[in-house]
Amino acid sequence: MSFDRSKTPRWRPGYRFQYEPAQKGHVLLYPEGMIKLNDSAALIGGLIDGERDVAAIISELEIQFPGVAELGEDIEQFMEVARAQHWIELA
């Protein structure tokens, strides 16, 4: 089954993406705690705004990182993990 890049991700209610100076990186805050994101996840997370679909997020990152092999597949994988962990909703 292929991933539907026309879906628009948004953070679930109660989840907030932000830079956390104490962690020296981006985190995802939620009522029960916090998840520190790696640099790649932070770049993707910074583009999740409830407006852009996955295809637009991929296009934006392809502009920033031209020639990176399998970039689209990596972003799809992040979206699948984030959805499975209930961080995002895809509509």
Curated annotation (Swiss-Prot):
InterPro entries: PQQD, PqqD_bac, PqqD_sf
Pathway involvement of the protein, from the record: Cofactor biosynthesis; pyrroloquinoline quinone biosynthesis
Keywords linked to the UniProt accession: PQQ biosynthesis
GO MF entries: quinone binding
Gene Ontology BP terms: pyrroloquinoline quinone biosynthetic process
HAMAP family membership: PQQ_syn_PqqD
Family statement: Belongs to the PqqD family.
Job of this protein: Functions as a PqqA binding protein and presents PqqA to PqqE, in the pyrroloquinoline quinone (PQQ) biosynthetic pathway.
Quaternary organization: Monomer. Interacts with PqqE.
Name of this protein: PqqA binding protein
Organism classification: Bacteria, Pseudomonadati, Pseudomonadota, Gammaproteobacteria, Pseudomonadales
